[in-house]
Regions:
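Transmembrane-helix signature of 12-pass secondary carriers
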Residues: 2-444
Length: 444
């Protein structure tokens, strides 16, 4: 939005215009670290049941389909959770939403650690999913609303690299505590909810959200804090603005202007998420079908997680240079190629080679997509827009373990199962082609 002069002589300036001239400061780094580790916690929580699945299955004597249902329970909780937190984050703010989500997750995750039956564990994991959805909805929206325009794409992709760190923590906690019980594994994981205090101390509220709420002074406080006083604008003499939509309205997402965006991003989310999660959720079991022991499988997954980091870093540099769409299409396409090759692996060396390529490009694409999705919507509906995409992801997350569990229960081969999963990546590429480019554009 460009600058305007009102009849009263007050200059109106879009918040996005302020961020075109804002330098990257230490305050951005502090806020970024707080939000980054919130995303790490999210990945940790999603992976912990998968990594402890063999212990839980042995304790409750679970068949593959029932274990798949347990793995998917947290994602079923995230379906209503994302929709709920999408409205909350647009109404009460990004910061409060993230703090409340982390705190409530910690309590519910701790409750799941004392489960004495399969169904108690299932429902407490479901409730944990509802609670953790607030972090999921707010992380990328919150971070990109704090960043200068020139740094937004690259820095937000770095945020996505918290996923493999969360995976590695889940592997480490499970490996260290496997000899005790899965109860201790979940109990230790629940302590991550205390990170809410770090978010409270380290990150300001989003200026975009504050302006949309009419909180001019709160927005200006955040801008002064983030810029460390190094703005060319005199904030005391301007009125900040954002594009106006009905705040937190799901209906706005399905009106003529935004419906094509909502339909396309939902389609990308379903296919892309299936192409990743259907494989990740059953990777320990799939590796056992190829003859790997549990320690060998943990090592395979850990090494694969390490390969994700250069994928994120490469995608971060490339998206800032060439934009979202080109890099997203190229990376998902190559991930699909490596996925089909992984399905045909006959030796351990081939499995490592093709899986490294698969996760390098897949996770690089996820970093771009997590950044891009929030940029597609204006401020007043960014939270609910992002939450719809995440809800579709969680539907995909919930269905994928069930379907793959069904296939494995019928002794479907490794090759056919992984090829089926990789087909969804092709669908994600097709839908991505029709989305608009947002690199270098201000948020509205």
């Amino acid at each position: 939005m460009t600058s305007l002069q009102t009849s009263a002589g007050t200059r109106q300036v879009g918040v996005g215009e302020i961020f075109t001239q804002m330098p990257l400061t230490r305050e951005h780094w502090k806020a970024g670290i707080a939000i980054f580790f919130s995303f790490v916690i999210e990945a940790w929580e999603m992976m912990i049941i998968i990594m402890a699945s063999d212990v839980i299955a042995a304790d409750f004597k679970l068949a593959p389909t029932k274990l798949g249902s347990l793995i998917g329970s947290i994602f079923l909780g995230m379906i209503p959770g994302c929709l709920l937190w999408g409205k909350i984050t647009d109404y009460v703010g990004r910061k409060k939403s993230m703090m409340a989500s982390l705190a409530s997750y910690g309590v519910l995750s701790l409750a799941s650690s004392i489960s004495f039956s399969y169904w108690m564990l299932w429902w407490t994991r479901f409730a944990s999913g509802v609670a953790l959805s607030g972090v999921l909805v707010s992380s990328f929206v919150y971070f990109e609303e704090l960043l200068p325009v020139k740094s937004r794409g690259r820095a937000t992709v770095y945020l996505a690299s918290g996923w493999p760190i969360g995976m590695l923590i889940a592997i480490g906690v499970t490996h260290a505590l496997r000899a005790t019980s899965w109860h201790w594994i979940l109990a230790v994981s629940s302590l991550a909810g205390l990170w809410a205090f770090v978010v409270w101390a380290a990150a300001p509220e989003s200026p975009y959200w504050a302006v949309g709420e009419g909180e001019q002074e709160l927005a200006k406080q955040s801008l002064r804090r983030l810029s460390q006083g190094r703005l060319t604008f005199d904030l005391d003499r301007i009125e900040l603005t954002v594009d106006e939509y009905k705040r937190g309205s799901f209906r706005e997402l399905f009106h003529r202007q935004l419906f094509p965006v909502t339909a396309l991003q939902s389609s990308v989310n379903f296919c892309f998420c299936w192409g990743y999660w259907a494989l990740a959720s059953w990777m320990p079991i799939l590796l056992s079908k190829k003859g790997l022991s549990t320690p060998q499988g943990d090592e395979f997954i850990a090494l694969t997680a390490l390969v994700m980091f250069p994928g994120y870093m490469t995608a971060s540099w490339l998206t800032a240079r060439y934009g979202r769409k080109k890099i997203m299409v190229i990376f998902i396409s190559l991930a699909a190629v490596f996925g089909f090759a992984f399905a045909q692996s006959t030796t351990l060396g081939q499995m490592y080679l093709w899986s490294f390529g698969l996760y390098f490009f897949n996770q690089g694409a996820w970093g771009v997509w997590d950044t891009w999705m929030g940029e597609l919507y204006p401020t007043d509906v960014r939270g609910v827009g992002y939450s719809v995409g995440l809800t579709v992801q969680r539907i995909s997350n919930s269905l994928a373990p069930l379907v793959i569990g069904f296939l494995l229960a019928r002794n479907t081969s490794f090759s056919l199962t992984v090829s089926f999963i990789s087909t969804f990546l092709v669908g994600a590429v097709i839908f991505t082609l029709f989305l608009k480019e947002t690199e270098g554009e201000v948020l509205h």
